[in-house]
From Swiss-Prot:
Organism per entry: Staphylococcus aureus (strain bovine RF122 / ET3-1)
Highest classification ranks of the organism: Bacteria, Bacillati, Bacillota, Bacilli, Bacillales
PANTHER family linked: POLYRIBONUCLEOTIDE NUCLEOTIDYLTRANSFERASE (PTHR11252), POLYRIBONUCLEOTIDE NUCLEOTIDYLTRANSFERASE 1, MITOCHONDRIAL (PTHR11252:SF0)
InterPro entries given in the database record: ExoRNase_PH_dom1 (IPR001247), ExoRNase_PH_dom2 (IPR015847), ExoRNase_PH_dom2_sf (IPR036345), KH_dom (IPR004087), KH_dom_type_1 (IPR004088), KH_dom_type_1_sf (IPR036612), NA-bd_OB-fold (IPR012340), PNPase (IPR012162)
Gene Ontology CC terms: cytosol
Annotated binding of Mg(2+), by residue: 490, 496
Protein family (similarity comment): Belongs to the polyribonucleotide nucleotidyltransferase family.
Alphabetized SUPFAM superfamilies for the sequence: Eukaryotic type KH-domain (KH-domain type I), Nucleic acid-binding proteins, Polynucleotide phosphorylase/guanosine pentaphosphate synthase (PNPase/GPSI), domain 3, Ribonuclease PH domain 2-like, Ribosomal protein S5 domain 2-like
Catalyzed reaction equations: RNA(n+1) + phosphate = RNA(n) + a ribonucleoside 5'-diphosphate
Protein name, per record: Polyribonucleotide nucleotidyltransferase
Keyword set includes Nucleotidyltransferase: yes
Gene that encodes the chain: pnp
Enzyme Commission number(s) from the entry: 2.7.7.8
Record-annotated membrane-spanning stretches: none
PROSITE patterns in the record: KH_TYPE_1 (PS50084), S1 (PS50126)
Cofactor names: Mg(2+)
């Protein structure tokens, strides 16, 4: 990498974009500093000197949010950054996906991309800056990379598309789209949307691609200026004679019939047996452990299986389980299968099954998100778990990984637009989707199961959501789009394009591909085929439950809303929170108070809610002119007595208002602790209350 500092500038969505090379992190294979507005990201690319064994490309993308970038000190005892949060993990995945397909086939060196956010401007996305930084770090390095790529964020407001919308614009946008690609095609899409049409989504994707092309041209100018010398990489050549011999054996032993097996586990077992039979043909009795030969035979066999699966789909239009390209697997769904939970839905599609379980909580049960932006209170959460047994495997049980975090977030994005507002449904909602069986499209099964759970719980959702995953097999001059892909089609195909939405439109999409990019024609056709599949699944789900239940579970907390004057909030809270804690301790409820005076009281028992409400009403109660009260004498003065009307409110009973008869001394008729009926005659501008007993005698 060049050791001389160089600075390159352009404009991006009305803000300055600067890329600097040659000054920082000079021992990395490639490093750039990206300045976008006041956002600053350091992106580095490093590769190992030797390749790794295995049949996968060991690429790792990291995205680190440094709290100092937003002028914050991390929370917790250690006061330093820990493991990446969910948002950072999702950003790392977002960057990985458009970059991964652009490395040479067969390249097995470890490659690590590091993105450090050094300064964060909320209106200048650090995520998009990191994507450009990752592309540039690879492009100016000696690592072989067929980029550059770029990514942009697209919003949709009042019928107009916007590149990299500000925080305020995102609040009113119907679309939150991240799209990435190179100059010729789109190769990554991620979006959440408020029921936009397929055509609107298509236009948004290619509106974003126009800006991507400009950014790629800018990066290419930098590469042409720096002229990095790339590592020489020569892919290993296949022994064609060996390939032909193995191919002949696979045909002889019935590879086609083995692939065309309905049951996933039976197919896997049959393929393993076929491979073992063929490998045994090559084992030399004098050298039975020739590992290099055995590895090569297995590698060729795996490639031949892939070629056969793709040939069957592309030429014969038949899939491994016998389906047609646009056919959906058998569907089954149930609700209310767990008696003590607040809502549950079981969704099964072929050999993929998800159990989604919903829990309702008080508003105070929200998740607090403390990242580089302002603190955020999240009242809807969707979590996804993928245990080993779901694919018939064993292994250690670990905390959720990148895949589980990503699938959970996709489901959350698909469903959040149908969740009712706090005013209509004052609850925190958490859904956990447990994948019990998996043969592809488990994330979309979790979305369908979650919709069932929401309706079973009685959540008044705006509309049901269903999800489906689309696949693709390309040939030189043709392509085949697949509806509802299974595991083998995902692994051996060219695309995993997930689409979720209501009957009216799309609420989320996510596209991953293994080829260079997709044309407008393919994306348009995939979206339309997904729409038809989504509606078919939706119709099945609505046969199980067609609308949310009218009542919540008996085990769900009840939430009652009441309103007080904003200036009374301090009375309910009390000094240092003393009063509100007393209410919570006495009644066992959860209290959430908004700045406008709205109070949410939550508890399982209605009696607890009623008692808490009574206490709050007593605290915030106000005297009214003309009302009568049974008052208690609290203090006596020469000019009258101060009486308590109710907790927190006293009134002056002047000596002239005690009786219609003349009184010389207050003590002649009243003493502290006496009860006397009074009528409120006046409340002055300072809120002081005057009362009269005499008015009741006349």
């Amino acid at each position: 990498m060049s050791q001389e500092k160089k600075v390159f500038k352009t404009e991006w969505a009305g803000r300055s974009l600067t890329i600097e090379t040659g000054q920082l992190a000079k021992q990395a294979n490639g490093a750039v500093l990206v300045r976008y507005g006041d956002t600053v990201v350091l992106s580095t690319a490093t590769a190992s000197k030797e390749p790794r064994d295995g049949d996968f490309f060991p690429l790792t993308v990291n995205y680190e949010e440094k709290m100092y970038a937003a002028g914050k000190i991390p929370g917790g005892f250690k006061k330093r950054e820990g493991r990446p949060g969910d948002d950072a993990t999702l950003t790392a995945r977002l960057i990985d996906r458009p970059i991964r397909p652009l490395f040479p086939k067969g390249y097995k060196h470890d490659v690590q991309i590091m993105n450090m956010v050094l300064s964060a401007d909320p209106d200048c996305s650090p995520q998009m800056a990191a994507m450009i930084g990752s592309s540039m770090a690879l492009s100016v390095s000696d690592i072989p990379f067929q980029g550059p790529i770029a990514g942009v964020n697209v919003g949709y407001i009042d019928g107009k598309y916007i590149i990299n919308p500000t925080v305020e614009e995102k609040e009113v946008s119907r679309l939150d789209l991240e799209v990435a690609g190179h100059k010729d095609a789109v190769n990554m899409v991620e979006a959440g949307a408020s029921e936009i049409t397929e055509q609107e989504m298509l236009e948004a994707i290619f509106f974003g691609h126009e800006e991507i092309q400009r950014l790629v041209d800018f990066q290419q100018q930098i590469v042409d200026h720096i002229q990095p010398v790339k590592q020489e990489f020569i892919p290993a050549e296949r022994d064609e004679a060996l390939v032909e011999r193995i191919k002949s054996l696979t045909e002889e032993k019935g590879l086609k019939e083995t692939v065309l097996t309905f049951d996933k586990q039976q197919r896997d077992e049959n393929l393993d047996n076929l491979k073992e039979e063929i490998v045994n043909e090559f084992i030399d009795e004098e050298d039975p452990e020739n590992e290099l030969l055995i590895k090569e035979v297995y590698a060729i066999l795996n490639e031949l299986v892939k070629e056969e699966v793709r040939r069957l789909i592309a030429d014969e239009k038949i899939r491994p389980d016998g389906r047609k390209p646009d056919e959906i697997r058998q569907l089954d769904s149930e609700v209310g299968i767990l008696p003590r939970t607040h809502g549950s839905g079981l969704f099964t599609r072929g050999q993929t099954q998800a159990l989604s379980v919903l829990t309702l909580g008080a508003l105070g049960d929200y998740q607090l998100i403390d990242g580089l932006g302002p603190e955020e209170e999240k009242r809807f959460m969707h979590h996804y778990n993928f245990p080993n047994f779901s694919v018939g495997e064993t292994g250690p049980v670990r905390a959720p990984g990148r895949r589980e975090i990503g699938h959970g977030a996709l489901g959350e994005r698909a469903l959040k637009y149908i969740i009712p507002d706090t005013a209509d449904f004052p609850y925190t909602i958490r859904i956990v989707s447990e994948v019990l069986e998996s043969n592809g499209s488990s994330s979309q099964a979790s979305i369908c199961g979650s919709t069932l759970a929401l309706m079973d719980a009685g959540v008044p959702i705006k509309a049901p959501v269903a999800g489906i995953a689309m696949g693709l097999v390309t040939r030189e001059d043709s392509y085949t789009i697949l509806t509802d892909i299974q595991g083998m089609e995902d692994a051996l195909g060219d695309m995993d394009f997930k689409v979720a939405g209501t009957k009216e439109g799309i609420t989320a999409i996510q596209m991953d591909i293994k080829i260079d990019g997709l044309t407008r024609e393919i994306i348009e056709e995939a979206l339309e085929q997904a729409r038809r599949g989504r509606l078919e699944i939706m119709n099945h789900m609505l046969q199980t439950i067609d609308q949310p239940r009218t009542e919540l579970s008996a085990y769900a907390p009840k939430v009652v809303t009441m309103t007080i004057k904003p200036d009374k909030i301090r009375d309910v809270i009390g000094p240092g929170g003393k009063k509100i804690n007393e209410i919570i301790d006495e009644t066992g409820v959860k209290l959430d108070i908004e700045q406008d005076g709205t109070i949410f009281i939550g508890a399982v028992d209605q009696a607890m809610i009623n008692r808490a409400r009574e206490i709050i009403e007593e605290i915030t109660r106000e005297a009214e002119v003309g009302q009568t009260y049974q008052a208690t004498v609290k203090r006596i003065e020469k000019y009258g007595a101060f009486v308590g009307l109710f907790p927190g409110k006293d009134a002056l009973l002047h000596i002239s208002q005690i009786s219609k008869n003349r009184i010389e001394k207050v003590e002649d008729v009243l003493k502290i602790g006496d009860t006397i009926e009074v009528k409120i005659t006046e409340i002055d501008k300072q809120g002081r209350v005057n009362a009269s007993h005499r008015a009741l005698e006349e």
